[in-house]
Amino acid sequence: MTHTETPPEESIELDPFLKLAQIVDSGGQAKHLIQAGYVRVNGEVETRRGRKLHHGDVVLVDDDVEIQVVIEPDE
């Protein structure tokens, strides 16, 4: 399953992004997924909850859910 998610800022940390994308319900769940190595950013396992995501980044969770980060420019 692939979808896009638009964070409200120019960048967003991985932990709150997973909550925004409704992959997890809490920061604790996000922490577990990230630290257990179930999250990839642009094809690389990411274990830092604070990893900054930017426009075009692709987040893959548990080799099942793929989300592309889309940042819309301010007008």
Report residues per predicted region.
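Exposed, low-complexity/repetitive linear segments and helix-based recognition motifs
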Residues: 10-12, 63
